[in-house]
């Protein structure tokens, strides 16, 4: 049972929401299917990159080394949308929202270890350098996740827990989500390409690691900023969540 994961108890209220995230991943049909699809696709990418020359050019190397990590953040694009089903309960105590945001960040940061491990065959095969994968993983956990989590401020459409997302709920047609997702995917690639051209590969990967670590180490600061901005819009968002159920 999820409640038996006592390892999370040491994190207090944030730990309880970590349990909730894990429970949601296992029981929520939409989140579970997204996760399974992501795992299968990452394995396919790893095999193709390791044993074929299909993605041997410079752009493909950068794109396909980043994509497995951004793929893990697909559920973050709809951050707070599943919670729209019971958002009024969370708002009974405002601190719940901050703890929930922290739990989401920690949970999705930890899950980045999965694509990192699955992509290790590309390192063994000599397709990608280990430093590149480390840079992409840490950069994703840093500025990329910071960008995606800011969607919690404006997301106000409830995502059904067990019905298909093709249902006309407005979740799938949120153009802000699409734009942010595209920026989160292609901005790091553009940044790596430009830096690589000027300072070389290894300094570029080290730069990504340093920037990523800076965001990771300051996560409580920018999560608190997101929380405060959410509280300013809580009634508007609450109305949106309740009307879209």
Question: What is each model feature region?
Answer:
Residues 87:
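A glycine- and small/hydrophobic-rich beta-loop-beta segment
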Residues 1-84, 97-245:
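Hydrophobic alpha-helical transmembrane segments of membrane proteins
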Residues 91-96:
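Short helix-to-coil transition segments within interhelical loops
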């Amino acid at each position: 049972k999820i409640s038996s994961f006592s390892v999370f108890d040491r994190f207090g209220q944030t730990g309880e929401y970590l349990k909730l995230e894990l429970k949601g991943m296992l029981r929520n049909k939409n989140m579970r299917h997204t996760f399974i699809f992501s795992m299968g696709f990452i394995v396919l990418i790893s095999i193709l990159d390791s044993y074929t020359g299909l993605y041997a050019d410079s752009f493909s190397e950068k794109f396909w080394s980043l994509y497995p990590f951004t793929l893990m953040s697909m559920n973050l694009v709809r951050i707070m949308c599943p919670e729209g089903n019971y958002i009024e309960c969370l708002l009974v105590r405002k601190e719940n929202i901050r703890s929930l945001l922290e739990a989401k960040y920690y949970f999705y940061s930890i899950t980045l270890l999965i694509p990192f491990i699955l992509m290790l065959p590309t390192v063994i095969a000599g397709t990608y350098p280990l430093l590149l994968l480390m840079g992409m993983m840490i950069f994703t956990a840093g500025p990329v996740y910071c960008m995606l989590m800011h969607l919690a401020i404006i997301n106000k459409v409830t995502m059904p827990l067990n019905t298909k997302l093709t249902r006309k709920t407005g979740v799938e047609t949120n153009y802000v989500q699409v734009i942010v997702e595209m920026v989160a995917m292609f901005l790091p690639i553009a940044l790596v390409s430009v830096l690589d051209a000027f300072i070389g590969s290894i300094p570029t990967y080290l730069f990504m690691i340093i920037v990523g670590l800076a965001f990771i180490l300051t996560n409580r600061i920018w999560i608190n900023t997101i929380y405060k901005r959410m509280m300013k819009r809580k009634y508007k968002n609450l109305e949106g969540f309740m009307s879209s159920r």
